[in-house]
Amino acid sequence: MRIIAGNWRGRPLIAPKGTETRPTADRTREALFSMLVSRLGTLDGLRVLDLFAGSGALGLEALSRGAGHCTFVEQDSAALDALRTNIAKLGAAPQCDVRAQSVMALGPAIAPYDLLLLDPPYRSGAGVVALERCLRLGWLASGALVTVETA
């Protein structure tokens, strides 16, 4: 697993130990971000919210491509270890906020986000619930884009 493009292109990422998470494949991330850049023109300066963040591959890819900030939300301890290691290895800490909590425990937003990256556990229904929660609690800016990975 690696960063596909941008400032950290080719830099390796570690995956969480165990079988609780399944990182988004490089090819899938490449296709997703190609679509996002095609739609937006650039990710420069965007505020990104990466829910069910796992290793952080999606949010870190956004930062590598110019996003200004990413908040990662993850509750699994192995995934958090991998996420924090990946952030440190890239020197990305100033642009990151890591929240070690359940996505379902998010309170009202302090400021809205421009891009929501949702990669919930497959067949859990958590993606729909998380999106509804983000909308209700003001996490999404007007015109924000949302991506959801499902099985």
Show which residues each predicted segment covers.
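Class I S-adenosyl-L-methionine-dependent methyltransferase catalytic core
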Residues: 1-151
